[in-house]
């Protein structure tokens, strides 16, 4: 409804990217593919630069990674997209990945593997449209951070955090883990 569409003419039918038939990989296959010994009790983090703000979100990314590190949350981190400042984001992610034994930074997973991972994760955290669009199809709770997805219709699986603080992250994690 961002462009003035009439609400009664909009029919939410799901994500077009989910129309592609895929075979779900087993947990064991994914562990081998990702080189992770135990793929349980984990979240998936996808955090992209915010291109329409002066602050690209790099400080938010650092705060988020610090909070997840401090609570020892096993986290599969996917590379950010290729927007402006994505190289800076990747460098921060690599730095945390090297210092934290509960972080697993991975490049392009491919759509089939990505969907399989969404089906196994406990929750997703970040600012990716994937959390708004695809995650609900897997009944995956999502913590959506910041303004990047403002204006998008979202499901009940999404918890929004506007102000990124450790306390807000903790509260949101408790909320999605109780779903």
Q: Where are the regions a protein language model picked out?
A:
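Nucleotide-activated sugar donor-binding and catalytic core shared by glycosyltransferases
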Residues: 1-179
């Amino acid at each position: 409804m961002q462009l003035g569409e009439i609400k009664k003419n909009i029919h939410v039918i799901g994500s077009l990217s989910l129309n592609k038939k895929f075979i779900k990989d087993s947990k064991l296959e994914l562990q081998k593919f990702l080189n992770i010994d135990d793929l349980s009790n984990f979240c998936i983090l996808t955090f992209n630069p915010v291109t329409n703000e002066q602050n690209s979100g790099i400080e938010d990314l650092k705060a988020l990674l610090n909070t997840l590190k401090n609570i020892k949350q096993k986290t599969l981190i996917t590379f950010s997209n290729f927007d402006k400042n994505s190289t800076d984001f990747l460098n921060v992610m690599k730095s945390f990945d090297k210092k934290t034994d509960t972080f697993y930074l991975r490049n392009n997973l491919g759509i089939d593997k990505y969907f399989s991972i969404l089906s196994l994760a406990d929750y997703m955290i970040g600012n990716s449209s994937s959390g708004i669009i695809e995650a609900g199809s897997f009944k995956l709770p999502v913590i959506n951070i910041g303004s990047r997805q403002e204006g998008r219709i979202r499901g009940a699986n999404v918890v929004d955090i506007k102000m990124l603080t450790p306390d807000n992250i903790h509260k949101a994690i408790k909320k999605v883990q109780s779903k």
